[in-house]
Amino acid sequence: VVMDTDGALDVKGIPTDSNIVYDLHLHTNLISFPFAGFASVEETIPEDTQSSIDAILGEGAAALNNHDTGEWYGGLEYLEGTKGYWFITNEEVSFSYNPPVEGAARQDSPIRSVPMEFAFRQSTQQAFYFVNSATIGGEPLDKEDIIIVYNGDVIVGSRYWYGETTDVP
């Protein structure tokens, strides 16, 4: 919509059918999560579909599928209603989300906000680094350590270490 004068725009939304079938093609697909609230990645994506998905990217968080163990790693543990996600697939696949379980308690995200001096501007071309382990002075990282990514002297990503396979945008 382009308006060249002051005016009012009245938009009426129609809820998405929760049984919508998403037809994903090979590689990158931008899709929505059609439910209110939150649902865990492992529970809302049908089990027989998960092997076709390598990763899911959200705003500032990612989930990486370990096909050997069937586990998801990274800070994106829950899909959130009204948000969009990039699904990275290794083959064409069609699926419908499993609806969230009523009354299911959402656990806190492992992602903590970093101090302002380590903040960065979110990019439309964001990438993620998945860090399995790291040391400082020969000592393993702990939950108070921050991983910082630079491009020259500009901070382009940062994340508190939260354990194995920390995603750093």
What are these regions (language model features)?
Residues 1-142, 146-169:
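N-terminal exported-region signature
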